Amino acid sequence: MVFFDSVLKKKCEFIPHEAKKANIYLCGPTVYDDAHLGHARSSVCFDFLRRVLLASGYEVVFARNYTDIDDKILKKMQESGKSLKEITNFYIKRYEEDMQALNILEPDFKPKATAYIEQMITYIEKLLELNLAYKLEDGIYFDTSKDDKYFYISKRNLEDNQSRLEESVAKKNDSDFVLWKFDEKFYPASFGKGRPGWHTECVVMIESIFKDKLDIHAGGIDLLFPHHENEACQCRCKNNHELANFWLHNGFVQINGEKMSKSLGNSFFLKDSLKLFNGEVLRFYLLSVHYRAHFNYALEDLQAAKKRLDKFYRLKKRLNLNAFIDEKTIIESKVSQNILDVLNDDLNASKALALLDEFINESNIYLDQNPKDKAYKIQLEKTLKELSFIFGIGFIDTIKYFQFGISEEKCQEIEEKITLRNKAKQEKNYVLADQIRDDLAKENILLMDTPNGVVWEKNG
């Protein structure tokens, strides 16, 4: 199993601290607003990584944090008149709803920064004791001149990154960063009341959960500098070892070729996409581009991803399979193992999805020729369950999948028309029955007569 290490800039064999055990930390959201597509991509990419490791026989401990104290949250407090907890709890709940829609496995740890304040204070006290930090009027800062390997993680240079550095005229070095911001409204500490800086929040949560055994630190490429650089700097100088064995980063999400960002005004919320397509379609779409590549969002590509996922559900429907349960599955089929082998090369999702397409097509051809082969159908069901777990798809009831986007009121109206059609057929009024079917077809509602009754689905 190899992954592209963002620090070494090459593919490296994955060697964890302990054999067949992977400890992963993913930088989560700052909870002051709803999740956007950038959050979705990072979550899907590294949930996929987690699934591949689990399917490959690894024990995985996965942590994804919440930054629940931050300048953006404080600004939201001022604008809304709500408390810190009211805002953060509200957006955490909404974020987790979005993650469930995307079939993101529940993290083993979901640390909130505010739950680790005491550990952060102790951490900063140690940095001061080691003369790695210093005090200014507005807070405590890390002295980056004490780190001979600063810029090791990001491979950046100071001249190219001035715009991303924290401003303070009194800093010893331009690259120095804040560990603690003085503020009388917040937490008491030996060095003065205040609140922690973002970079200290994450490194303390990582060390509290994983000690010195973090195998993979993951996140969006936009976090590489200064956030991940500054996390690593603190750990390296305080503990004399690197924060993580591997650094994995996913590429930007772009809208019409431009990086998605609120400052450019081209950012939109995940919930907006989930109104148009179910979460599995969006997940499948996000997996279609290699995690390290930049992802250009386009509605026509999302629609193409739906048609591709439809084929998976059509095969499930052909076998009369119910919604699968999302649980770890032992990989036994040759098809699943071949796909895993491809994914073990830096999560080569595009090649893996091509193999999935090929498998679905071949399965349909075989079933056309051998419709009564029960042994094949049993094995096919098992393989589909394995693939569902690996890709994180197939957990929606098949009928509901093809009815997505139809309101409850409209569903009731359709069912009433089906009842009228059934009555018309019983009375041998086939003209009326056909008229009802054709009228629904004009509304992109397709009726299908099956041995178990009439089923319907949305066309397109």
From Swiss-Prot:
Positions of Zn(2+) binding: C27, C202, H227, E231
Oligomer and partners: Monomer.
Chain location of the short sequence motif 'HIGH' region per the record: 29-39
UniProt cross-references to InterPro entries, sorted A to Z: Cys-tRNA-ligase (IPR015803), Cys-tRNA-synt_Ia_DALR (IPR015273), Cys-tRNA/MSH_ligase (IPR024909), Rossmann-like_a/b/a_fold (IPR014729), tRNA-synt_1_cat_dom (IPR032678), tRNAsynth_Ia_anticodon-bd (IPR009080)
EC number: 6.1.1.16
Record-stated family: Belongs to the class-I aminoacyl-tRNA synthetase family.
Entry keyword annotation includes Calcium: no
Gene this protein is translated from: cysS
Cofactor(s) it depends on: Zn(2+)
UniProt source species: Campylobacter lari (strain RM2100 / D67 / ATCC BAA-1060)
Keywords, sorted A to Z: Aminoacyl-tRNA synthetase, ATP-binding, Cytoplasm, Ligase, Metal-binding, Nucleotide-binding, Protein biosynthesis, Zinc
Note accompanying the cofactor annotation: Binds 1 zinc ion per subunit.
Motif ('KMSKS' region): 259-263
Lineage: Bacteria, Pseudomonadati, Campylobacterota, Epsilonproteobacteria, Campylobacterales
Record's catalysed reaction(s): tRNA(Cys) + L-cysteine + ATP = L-cysteinyl-tRNA(Cys) + AMP + diphosphate
GO BP: any one term: cysteinyl-tRNA aminoacylation
GO CC terms: cytosol
Pfam annotation, one family: DALR_2
SMART domains named among the record's database cross-references: DALR_2
Annotated protein name in UniProt: Cysteine--tRNA ligase
Principal subcellular localisation of the protein: cytoplasm
GO molecular function: ATP binding; cysteine-tRNA ligase activity; zinc ion binding
Protein location: Cytoplasm
Annotated residues for binding of ATP: K262
UniProt KW ATP-binding keyword: yes
